[in-house]
Amino acid sequence: MVGCLGDDEFGARLRAGLAAEGADVAGLRAIPGAVSGLALITVDPAGENSIAVAPGANGLAGAAEVAAAFAEPCDVLVLSAEVPAAALAAALRQARAARVRTVLNLAPVPGEAAALLAEGPDWLVVNAQEAAAVAGQPADGVPDDPARAQAIAASLAKGPAGGQVVVTLGAAGAVLAGPPGTAVVPGFVVTAVDTVGAGDAFVGALAVALASGVDPVAAVTAACAAGAAATTRRGAQEGLPRPADVLAATGFSWPA
């Protein structure tokens, strides 16, 4: 895990929580005088969430974090748009030179989205609203229209990035576009209590599945299962499922 934290109680708690889960936190830099990024999350009775974010130290990630990302060999590099676009672009270039596969999650969509796609991420992951924003199209109705989401994904896959594009559709699953074509990956039926962290679970599971060597459709299927399982548990980090949780919630067995 690479990024910036504030030199505060929240940063200490975040570092300790990640370390307790077995994450290597050597790449987390505490910035003196900075505050850690925070999110205020509300969840409605149906389990849907809304989030207000104060980026804090996330906005200070730069060359040191890019260097830390490549301090050890890796199979897949996951990049979040919650850090400055300049750092993301530098990491994409270095990953390409090192032949490391990249998964770019453009959430939220930055003003530099087009420039980042021009850096050629291997995978782009966005939700329906984000996909429409990146494509310069109206977002109205996209989450409920898989055919339109598929068309947007296909158009993005033919753009500067030229890699695999995934548009997540919540409970409906996801759309995959890229070589050799497009596919709709259905969601898993679960009883959702809290959708916080579902997108994070999706992206993390996708990266792990890709590192295990499965094909794109299988990787997105695993990601859909993990995202669905995350909605059956409350909380953000504490709600992220393990393979046994995914199996219990969805019946999906993690790729061997």
Where are the regions a protein language model picked out?
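Conserved phosphate-binding/catalytic region of the ribokinase-like
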Residues: 111, 137-256
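Aromatic/hydrophobic pocket-lining residues that form π-stacking "cages" and hydrophobic walls in ligand
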Residues: 14, 90-93, 226
